[in-house]
Every structure is written in structure tokens, then in C-alpha cells.
């Protein structure tokens, strides 16, 4: 058992290093990992902001090791129960704030509805709310850059 723990830490450390190499939406990455049917990075590319800079061989090697470790049968229920599909992101909150400032509370209501069941698939909300940070939010204060005032 001790060697498994050491090996487990190694695979986790390698995952962390890989996730740092390319800008990744962690929520989408871990949610999509729950659904893969084979250890191929192509099934997870939606989670990356720059698909061209993905070190595919390194990713496929990691996925193969993980896949072998779970014997090709990841515990999907456990993974899905621990990786929400929908989380409140700064850009989503900003959309709700912008609309509310114009007396339109529909975005707040929609976000409230989505976030009541963050682990559910909710296909009706997928296109609008299951996505990486939009380009408009990349440099907008409050969406990607946060400040702290004292």
C-alpha cells in the first residue's frame, strides 16, 4: 500500500504540472474527465483556452497511466458527485450585475436557477453557462483581475 500512495502522489503531481502548462478551465476539465471513454486528450480539449499549445503526448501519457490505474473503469458517479458542471464565475456575476444595473434581473434569476443544481447536466443552460471565460472578460476588471481594498 505505501508504494501506491507514493505512486498516487506522483500521478497527481504530474497532473498539476500538466494543468499549469496550458491555460485550462479546471471546472470544465474535471467535469469532462468524468465522461471520457478512452484515454485521449482530444476528448478534453474543450477545457483548454489554446488548443494549439496542448502538449498532446504528455497528456496522452498521463491519461493512459490514469486509465490503467482505474482499470478503464473510472468511478464516474464519484467523479460527477464531486465535480460540479456549473459554478458561479466572475464573468457570469458581471453579466448579472450589468443587467441588474439596467433593472433587468432575468440574468440573476437564470443564474440562480442554474446554480441550484450545479451537478445536474441541465442541457438547456449548457450553451450559455457551461463555457470558458469569454474573451471580453479576459481583461475586464472584476472578471479576470480582482483587487482587494483595505
Positions of PLM-derived features:
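Single conserved hydrophobic/aromatic residue that forms the stacking wall/gate
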Residues: 1-6
Amino acid at each position: 500500500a505505501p508504494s501506491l500512495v507514493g505512486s498516487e502522489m506522483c500521478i497527481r503531481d504530474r497532473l498539476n504540472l500538466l494543468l499549469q502548462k496550458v491555460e485550462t478551465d479546471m471546472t470544465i476539465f474535471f467535469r469532462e474527465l468524468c465522461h471520457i471513454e478512452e484515454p485521449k486528450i482530444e476528448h478534453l480539449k474543450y477545457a483548454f483556452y489554446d488548443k494549439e499549445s496542448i502538449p498532446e503526448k504528455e497528456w496522452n501519457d498521463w491519461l493512459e497511466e490514469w486509465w490503467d490505474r482505474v482499470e478503464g473503469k473510472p468511478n464516474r458517479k464519484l467523479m460527477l458527485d464531486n465535480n460540479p458542471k456549473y459554478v458561479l464565475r466572475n464573468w457570469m456575476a458581471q453579466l448579472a450585475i450589468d443587467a441588474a444595473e439596467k433593472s433587468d434581473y432575468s440574468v440573476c434569476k437564470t443564474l440562480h436557477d442554474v446554480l441550484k443544481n450545479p451537478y445536474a447536466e441541465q442541457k438547456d443552460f449548457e450553451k450559455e453557462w457551461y463555457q470558458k471565460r469569454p474573451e471580453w472578460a479576459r481583461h475586464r476588471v472584476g472578471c479576470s483581475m480582482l483587487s482587494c481594498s483595505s
